[in-house]
Swiss-Prot record:
Part of the 50S ribosomal subunit. It holds the Pfam family Ribosomal_L6. HAMAP family: Ribosomal_uL6_B. This is Large ribosomal subunit protein uL6. GO terms for cellular component: cytosolic large ribosomal subunit. It comes from the Bacteria. GO terms for molecular function: rRNA binding; structural constituent of ribosome. Coiled coil: none annotated.
């Protein structure tokens, strides 16, 4: 039995779950999410909790059991509280600006990099060097934050670039030169 998969998911107040066959939809104060569930995994609502069980002990059912439980738990957390990812921009002259759902990054290229956020993702900028990406879909949020970071990943010599808040960037020594 999967250690993660067998744990029940508590349902917060104001969150409703609708399960129709292999289609799951979760509604809450922040919005609603839908997901198609894989076969051989059964999701059931029992009062104020959601349980995830598997149909049989096949390899695919065992593989997906913990995954589906985590995905459903992330959906419930997302519609209840939402998720947030913070990125820091380091480097002389590097800065960001947000206008609506567009993010403009000035990170050392000849032209500013403009990114349009997908639907359901909000972006804010604090003091030109902190980008806050928020939304209810954890998977989409992580992918969006990774795309922003990929515009200028932190380099190991001076540490310039876009990094996640709290991310450790391993530094390298530069060339020592001949004397």
């Amino acid at each position: 039995m999967s250690r993660i998969g067998k744990r029940p998911i508590p349902l917060p107040a104001k969150v409703s779950v609708d399960i129709q066959g292999s289609h799951l939809s979760v509604k809450g104060p922040k919005g609603s999410l839908e997901r198609q569930l894989p076969e051989k995994v059964i999701v059931a609502q029992e009062g104020e909790t959601i349980t995830v069980t598997r149909q049989d002990e096949s390899r695919t059912a065992r593989e997906r059991h913990g995954l589906v439980r985590t995905l459903v738990a992330n959906m419930v957390d997302g519609v209840a509280q939402g998720f947030e990812r913070r990125l820091e921009i380091q480097g002389v002259g590097y800065r960001a600006q947000a206008q609506g759902n567009k993010l403009t990054l000035n990170v050392g290229y000849s032209k500013p990099v403009e990114m349009t956020m997908p639907q359901g993702i909000e972006v804010k900028v604090e003091n030109n060097t902190q980008v806050i990406v928020s939304g209810i879909d954890k998977e989409l949020l992580g992918n969006t934050a990774a795309k922003i970071r990929a515009v200028r990943p932190p380099e190991p010599y001076k540490g310039k670039g876009i990094r996640y808040q709290g991310e450790y960037v391993r530094r390298k020594a530069g060339k020592t030169g001949k004397k």
